[in-house]
Amino acid sequence: MFGGKSHILRGSVSLALIVLILLVIILLVSEENPLRDSLFEVKRQFSSSSSSSSSVCNFAKGKWVEDRKRPLYSGFECKQWLSSMWSCRIMGRPDFSFEGYRWQPEGCNMPQFDRFTFLTRMQNKTIAFIGDSLGRQQFQSLMCMASGGEDSPEVQNVGWEYGLVKAKGALRPDGWAYRFPTTNTTILYYWSASLSDLVPMNNTDPPSLTAMHLDRPPAFMRNYLHRFDVLVLNTGHHWNRGKIEGNHWVMHVNGTQVEGEYLKDIRNAKDFTIHSVAKWLDAQLPLHPRLKAFFRTISPRHFKNGDWNTGGNCNNTVPLSRGSEITGDDGSIDATVESAVNGTRIKILDITALSELRDEAHISGSKLKPRKPKKASNVTSTPTINDCLHWCLPGIPDTWNELFIAQI
């Protein structure tokens, strides 16, 4: 008797379960069912999130867009870190429309910079910039960004820890190092325009000639690499005959002066040096597992109608007159840096193409005065020197740092 009732009960439960399943299916396939829409939305968000996390953002492709929150700091107030020659507001530039744009990468979002978040992320870390004056601009930009462009007496000058002190008779030290004590974050810059090791050839007369060892990274980098958590390298604009001869640099490889014609070609010497320093650094990275290394591509020049010393200028003041977008294979990527870091653990910080669009953001004629001729009687007029190499700050190097921070 009890077995029969049990069988009937199980049959009723099974029938009810089947009916319930059918109702759920009908609800899910109904186009007007809100539950269906919610489930599909969850699935879409999950898929989108998975896709974003699995793909690598190419920050070099994208477009410049207007942003009323710019600039990130004041060119008037960041005097503690910013050289006056690069502060176009201090130097009297009358137009500042170039400040009101940010870079929007294609297909991904670049986090909005927040100095407190940045310093917290960089707690107990050291960020080092090693390169030429454009590297120094990026360093000063990051100091202004991290301090909010405000005087920060609590920030400590720790240059002495890295041997960055002004030598007797020098105009300035070879670099600077500052520490934010609240997070123990150190940001430093070392001047090495060629990223090669420079050694006086005559110790009794150091200014005479300097051996430029193309196959050796700067001694500063070799000596302090173990203290860095993040490293950004750059070189480029000192690789010309005038700079090398003017600095009395004599190129060396394997400890001996270069004799072959191949490396006497400045372009080949530059290519050789960049590949050499990248190869050396990549070999060091396994020994310093916490170190993240970047090689920044070259910053473009925008001289027209001549060069810096022949009346060249970049007097355009209209933002984005060259266009606003970099897509596909557009751009002028630094092929030498790209080749050097290919297959290494070093990341490329590609800023060339996006900076190429911003010719109006250079210092131009805001800074430099006309050159004084040696003999006025021999010169009827002296052209104004325009700076179409360096950038106004605040300005384009702030964007370089945003791309850099997004990739740390």
From Swiss-Prot:
The keyword Transmembrane helix applies. InterPro entries: TBL_C, TBL_N. GO terms for molecular function: transferase activity. The chain crosses the membrane at residues 11-31. Keywords: Membrane, Signal-anchor, Transmembrane, Transmembrane helix. Pfam families: PC-Esterase, PMR5N. It comes from the Eukaryota. Coiled coil: none annotated. GO terms for cellular component: Golgi apparatus; membrane. It is a single-pass type II membrane protein. May act as a bridging protein that binds pectin and other cell wall polysaccharides. Probably involved in maintaining esterification of pectins. May be involved in the specific O-acetylation of cell wall polymers. Belongs to the PC-esterase family. TBL subfamily. Contains 2 motifs that are conserved in esterases, but it is unlikely that this protein belongs to the catalytically active pectin esterases. This is Protein trichome birefringence-like 14. It comes from Arabidopsis thaliana (Mouse-ear cress). The lineage of its organism: Eukaryota, Viridiplantae, Streptophyta, Embryophyta, Tracheophyta.
